[in-house]
């Protein structure tokens, strides 16, 4: 399939391309960024079992997707200079320091990405979430709003599937590595429980309009 994509790109557009393949979107992105461009075939594949030998050796930390220069400096001050050290750092301390971004950093360091289907439903779980990796920088507000709407629809759909409603809505946005990372995370508890897409979207849009700094996503 990867070779077929490369052949199609060359045949239709005259462009050579590299391909990253992984057990999830994160690993495929890392395979693309960190290895595929160095191979003769332009193709690289990363599996979960490759994480200790490939991902954990990555340094500086800013080579890791989602870690900008500012975040790298913060982690360095905590004694973390490799992805392996990040993976072994206590999750609760990362969450205390960075909030939801700390949670994402920890699981990404283990090669775990929940962006496609959200967190697995556990016994007694009463929350639904979805994160999404953007494979290019988004700078236009209307583009970002479209992505937000898609995410809200997925979360609302899952809530409706399980016949659940919720009152607390959270939105976290991380900025591009070109912007030295960073971002924001905000939560709000609304008056009435909902699983309606537009109710969730309006709340997230309020966060976006109030806290988005105009940096690349």
From Swiss-Prot:
Q: Which GO terms describe its biological process?
A: error-prone translesion synthesis; SOS response
Q: Which InterPro entries does the entry link to?
A: DNA/RNA_pol_sf, DNA_pol_Y-fam_lit_finger_sf, DNA_pol_Y-fam_little_finger, DNA_polymerase-Y, IMS_HHH_1, Rev_trsase/Diguanyl_cyclase, UmuC
Q: Gene3D superfamilies from the xrefs?
A: 3.30.70.270, 5' to 3' exonuclease, C-terminal subdomain (1.10.150.20), DNA polymerase, Y-family, little finger domain (3.30.1490.100)
Q: At the top level of its lineage, which domain of life is listed?
A: Bacteria
Residues of the UmuC domain:
1-68
Q: Which GO terms describe its molecular function?
A: damaged DNA binding; DNA-directed DNA polymerase activity
The entry assigns this protein to a family as follows: Belongs to the DNA polymerase type-Y family.
Put simply, this protein is called DNA repair protein homolog YobH
What organism does this protein naturally occur in?
A: Bacillus subtilis (strain 168)
Lineage from the top down? Bacteria, Bacillati, Bacillota, Bacilli, Bacillales
